[in-house]
Design a protein with these regions (language model features):
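Serine-dependent acyl-ester chemistry module
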Residues: 142-170, 202-228
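Catalytic His-Asp segment of secreted/periplasmic serine-dependent ester chemistry enzymes
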Residues: 201-303
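A structural motif corresponding to the C-terminal end of an alpha-helix
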Residues: 84-93, 177-195, 230-248
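Short, solvent-exposed beta-strand-terminating loops
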Residues: 52, 56-58, 135-149, 199-207, ...
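Secretory targeting and sorting signals
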Residues: 1-38
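Structural recognition of the beta-strand scaffold that forms the well-ordered cores
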Residues: 46-51, 55-57, 93-98, 127-132, ...
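Short, well-structured alpha-helical segments in soluble
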Residues: 108-125
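Serine-esterase "nucleophile elbow" of acetyl-processing enzymes
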Residues: 39-98, 119, 148-153
Length: 304
């Protein structure tokens, strides 16, 4: 049975052990067929992925064998977590409608001339939906660029917090009805679907940061971290109120200030992926978290 997160609070470091534990458990069940029968993941026939660039995965290099190329208009890669998840679950009726730069309105209107509204991908037969949306409506990119500019004047202070004041909290509250509407409309179009609202990976650490490689003033790092936590919490509340399951992927220790073999989100000068976006490791970790919510164990090589 799917479990529903009660809160969008940051993960304890112990949660990092979840994919490993799931993989170990699945291995032990191979030797016990009777037990395995009771632990099988639910089967899905028709999966639709909706969302923005944290779903689409712009500019992630092909680090695994794939026959498909990124969709250039939406900068959608075959290395994103929905594609990984569909492959792990053996789902062949899979539509990835996610698109870089998408805002909530792009779920209802064409984002480009040749890109239909994302919600058009849903049908009454759709039985699995993952969603990641509202980061662009909140203005992640604009806020980070403004804070980078502000940091030049006072890298040890909190100039961005002074610049925005309570505005970011208000942005989160203003987005509530839009996010609520998305999950209500998904339920109406695909009433039998299991719907998972996927949160945003941690971008910045809790404190200090790594100025100047990521030019956010030390005092502004916790300010922005709290803003992202508030956005994830709002998404969780509105999605769960409409029958969706929130998947908390906000696990600390994988932010832009970490080394390339540890971070899940790239910094302003990326090595694999777009600036301040998930990299391959981040997408793989997200697939692990979503899979665990569905009872799908991570591949053994992922958990190693």
């Amino acid at each position: 049975m799917l479990r529903t997160s009660a809160t969008a609070a940051p993960r304890s470091p112990r949660r990092a052990l979840v994919p490993v534990a799931v993989a170990a458990l699945s291995a032990s069940l191979v030797a016990a067929p009777a037990a395995a029968e009771t632990a099988q993941a639910p089967a899905f026939d028709s999966y639709v992925s909706l969302g923005d660039s944290f779903v689409a995965g712009p500019l992630i290099r092909e680090e695994r064998v794939s026959s498909s190329m990124p969709l250039l208009g939406c900068l959608r890669t075959s290395n994103n977590y929905p594609t990984m998840l569909a492959e792990r679950m053996g789902i062949t009726d899979f539509t990835d409608a996610s698109c870089s730069g998408a805002v909530v309105n792009d779920l209802y209107e064409p984002q480009f001339d040749d890109t239909p509204p994302q919600l058009d991908a849903l049908t009454p037969e759709t039985d699995l939906v993952t969603v990641g949306i509202s980061g662009n409506d909140f203005g992640f990119s604009e806020v980070l660029l403004e804070c980078a500019k502000q940091s030049l004047s006072n890298p040890l202070g909190d100039p961005c917090a002074e610049h925005y004041g309570d505005e970011l909290d208000q942005r989160v509250e203003d987005l509530r009805p839009e996010v609520a509407g998305v999950y209500a409309d998904i339920a109406e179009r695909s009433p039998d679907a299991t719907v998972l609202a996927v949160g945003y990976l941690q971008i910045l650490p809790e404190s200090r940061g790594c100025w100047p490689s990521t030019p956010i003033a030390w005092g502004d790092v916790p300010f922005l971290d709290r803003a992202q936590t508030a956005l994830n919490a709002m998404i969780a509340e509105e999605a769960e109120a409409r029958g969706a399951v929130f998947v908390d992927v906000f696990e600390r220790g994988h932010d832009v200030c970490q080394s390339s073999d540890t971070r899940w989100v790239e910094g302003l000068i990326p090595e694999n992926g777009a600036p301040v976006h998930p990299n391959f490791l981040g997408m793989r970790a997200t697939a692990d978290f979503v899979g665990a919510e569905l009872g799908v164990p991570a591949p053994v090589d992922d958990a190693a």
